[in-house]
Amino acid sequence: MDLMEQVRAKAAANPQKVAFFEADDPKMMEVVGELTKDGLCECYIVGDGETLRGVAEQVGVDLSKITVVDVNDADENEAFAQRFEAAPDSPFKAKAIRRRAKKPMDRALMMQRIDEVDINFGGLCCSTGEVILGGLTYIGLADGVDTISSLGVFNIPGWDGSEGPLLGFGDAAVCVDPDPEQLASIAITSAETVHALMGWEPRVAMLSYSTDGSAEG
């Protein structure tokens, strides 16, 4: 079983509630349709309801098993704002909650904060910086984590390591010029992530961007 088959099997065994705040993009809507058809998660699409239904029709996605969260539905916005206000440690005032709840990414992340969904998926249309800032604003860092980082899993033809052709690399996308403490945090978080996702027993090598000025820039 290859990596993606493993991940799909885990998802099917324990489907999570996933919010998609960019489903007004046809590519993302197609992803939502495929995930729903395969039973890999419960999909919540967040945005302008009329637009989302139009895109779904355009790409042939059946919305009967997908929850549409219409950020322009005034009654539902008010009901959601009241639920958010009632949650412990709500970080915003009433007016700000109602304003933010009308924005698809903000609404989706707010839903995650109060456990109406488990996960958010995005970044196709929004920038990495926007998604990270939104996550920090509404969700925050996991306990024990003090540095934001990313992890990529690479399938390298010809490589035969402890996990076959697969290697995890962190962090190649988010934290620029980390100090020693940040490097340590990234290494620990990367190891924990590959163990949680793939069940690997991680072995960590610390690789330098540049050796004695060989890669200036």
Show where each model-derived region lies:
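Anion-binding alpha/beta catalytic cores of soluble intermediary-metabolism enzymes, centered on
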Residues: 1-217
